[in-house]
Amino acid sequence: MMERTYGRRKPGMLNDDVSRAEHIFPSSSSPELEPVDFSTQESSCVWNYSSRSTFSDNDFSEKRNKRPRNGGGGFGSNSTLMEAQEFGELIENEDEVNFALDGLKKGHKVRIRRAALSSLLSICESQYQRRSLRALGISQSIIDAILGLCLDDIPSNLAAATLFFVLTTDGQDDHFMESPNSIKFLVKLLRPVVSASTKVKPRNIGSRLLSIIKDVDAARDAASMHDLSSCDIIDRAQEILVNCKELRLIDSYKIERMRPELSTKWVALLVMEKACLSKISFDDTSGTVKKSGGMFKEKLRELGGLDAVFDVVMDCHTVMESWVTHDTLSVEDIKDDLNKQSLMLLLKCLKIMENATFLSTENQIHLLRLNKSMGSHESRLSFTELMISVIKILSGLQLRAHRNEKHPHPQPHLASAVKKGFVTIISSDTCSTTGFSSIKSLSVSKRNQSAFLVGCSTTPKPGSQSSVMSTIDHCTLTTTAGSNTGSFAGRLASLGSGISRSKTRTSQTRESSCKKVENFASFEDSQDPFSFDLEDSGPSRWAVGKQKKSKGQKRKGSYRDKKDERSLQLFSSQEESNHGLNSQEESSDRDHHVTEQPSLTYDIDKGCLCLLSDCLLTAVKVLMNLTNGNSVGCREVAACGGLESMAELVVGHFPSFTRSPLYSQMESGTCHQKDKHLTDQELDFLVAILGLLVNLVEKNGINRSRLAAASVPITNPEGLQDSEQDMIPLLCSIFLTNKGSADTKDETSTFTLDDEEAVLESEKEAEKMIVEAYSALLLAFLSTESRSIRNAIRDYLPKRDMAILVPVLDRFVAFHTTLDMIPPETHKVVMEVIESCKLP
């Protein structure tokens, strides 16, 4: 049997005179052995060409026929060049993995550990390489080494979390995630302990001033993330997550460099979210839906995983409370990346809670019993209270954003902005007579102007335009934290001044990406008086592609650019200080100038609103799972104000239902509300709210009475209370507005997929049927509580007849019965409600 060994070649060993035949073959005269008639890069220095001359063509063919084909190791003479190259790459990867695993052993320094993890990230970058490692049985060795790491270094933690994610979610055994070691490792990633003995370089005056504002650990963490090895790990981790389409498809964000998602907690939560997904199997023969899969959710609860996720939600809630407390946020109070990362972590935690409570009564009970103290306060907050508080905060932020989009307010003058602690951007564009001066974004605060002046470098570079600092009297700027600076804190918390991201062509934008810094540097180097505009001064993609520059040099240059930029931005974000992850905006072809007149338009950041909407929808789904067939959960949610909160969500986010006319006007055709087409996000949100209300009133008479008597205040576009809306007319309005034409339409009518109008109409009808069914079920449950409530509902229905609900409820029950998704006791209750609706 031929046995091929692989050895790492050193430079200068291509022509070495080694006994290759003895190294590869036990004996050159063995009948089992044969030379291979191809030449590759690997074989150019391995195969002994002198031994090939001892064989003739006849001998070679004779030995080839005698050789048994048992599929053993090595290559036969019929191996192709591609197969040989692939085999060489496999062996090379195996060798690289072994070297990297040696670097992960205990006792090595942090820099060695980082280098080893960076090497493993590069090896596991593509799915093909990961499959090859799994085929060789090496992936399990990598996972075992990662589970035994000491999590005392932030970059190493990020690399370990990324490797664990990509190796466990890419075809790994499902039951592997249920092991205690895996779950404990994920919990440790959510609660990392950074060693205080980590040695860092002496900090400069800027870092020392920064430590006054923040804690010493934050400054040390920032220093640990700003070296070349950390940047290399961040780049490789981001590339893997982008290739897995996690950054783009899950959070609906553009691919950016140094995104806030690139944190250890976010990746660990991502792994938990994937593992908590319950697998649903559909039986083709019976048409039933059943749950299948492992027990990761239960193991996660038993080993403290849900408690750790609850702690992360508490931290995010603390940050969100500060958004409500501060009408206008100063740069020292809340940093940009902290807000962005808080929402992203919150979304992942809510996804985990949603998946963990789905079809798991034990997890529902465990979360309902959870309560933690609120920091230094003596009061304790239960999980239900926490979720309702999160829903209220998110709803308020989203509603203010929409109001500011429709009714923007003028931006305040710079003097008032500085007085209120706004973030101010001073640009040399308006203070210099030269049109090519570079833009330097400087953060100014009221309390730390002296620290700002110390941290800024005002020495101009030779042959370049310097950034000019002027007073308010010389330069009239109109930038605020809520609109033009691009600050996430201003976009979310200072919603009274408008939510905006730095996308408007008429506003000043903070330059935070390395691409912009590189453009300025290239212009300063060229100094061509006939050069084009700044955005065209950078090298083209073809020019960059032709430059033969190593990855290390590229990362080094990028690191230096980012370091120069940080020196001009003393008050960086929380993520930059703790993790060094510099969130950068994807550059686009637009002008960046400061307007001399106040801007009256606001460009609402769609990405931020989408993130808020996702968090709000998922939080409602968590409560819906907690109350699904759980009487304790229904009592807890109702006791914490869940009924009133859901009613406020309907009124606030769907104001059109409060303005719907009476049913007589709907029948006459004067109402245009039926033509409204809900978006997928709005439809899911409305259905989740109605589903939660159905769970709350299904088996609880007290909740039925409270919901029927509820009255929700209606606010005007300025945010002031205008009137009140009773719940019964509101629910009847939802039902009548979404009542489809399924009862009158000929079911035998068909349409083709080419008919676009027919397809869209069918889609609208399907959406209406879903909302119609849940609203009808909710009205039917309320009608069974008392005669007065039943009469109140009849007053808002056509012909004062409750029988209009019966066909809708029959279709609802038939659908869920077909899929076997309705419990027997629930089916019995619904059938009794349907019979009651048939009574006069």
Swiss-Prot record:
Gene ablation phenotype (knockout): Plants missing both WAPL1 and WAPL2 have relatively normal growth (slightly slower) and development but exhibit a significant reduction in male and female fertility (aborted pollen and ovules prior to fertilization and embryo defects in fertilized seed), due to blocked removal of cohesin from chromosomes during meiotic prophase (late zygotene/pachytene stage) resulting in chromosome bridges, broken chromosomes and uneven chromosome segregation, and leading to shorter siliques containing fewer seeds; this double mutant restores pollen viablitity to pollen-lethal ctf7 mutation.
Signal peptide (UniProt feature, chain positions): none
Record family assignment: Belongs to the WAPL family.
Annotated protein name in UniProt: Wings apart-like protein 2
Tissue-specific expression: Expressed in roots, leaves, buds and siliques.
Function: Regulator of sister chromatid cohesion in meiosis which negatively regulates cohesin association with chromatin, acting as an antagonist of CTF7. Cohesion ensures that chromosome partitioning is accurate in both meiotic and mitotic cells and plays an important role in DNA repair. Essential for the prophase removal of cohesin during meiosis thus determining the timely release of meiotic cohesion. Important for proper spindle attachment and assembly during meiosis. Helps to prevent abnormal centromere association during prophase I in meiocytes. Required for early embryonic patterning.
Location of the WAPL domain: 764-819
Entry annotated with the keyword Nucleus: yes
Organism: Arabidopsis thaliana (Mouse-ear cress)
Annotated Polar residues bias: 569-585
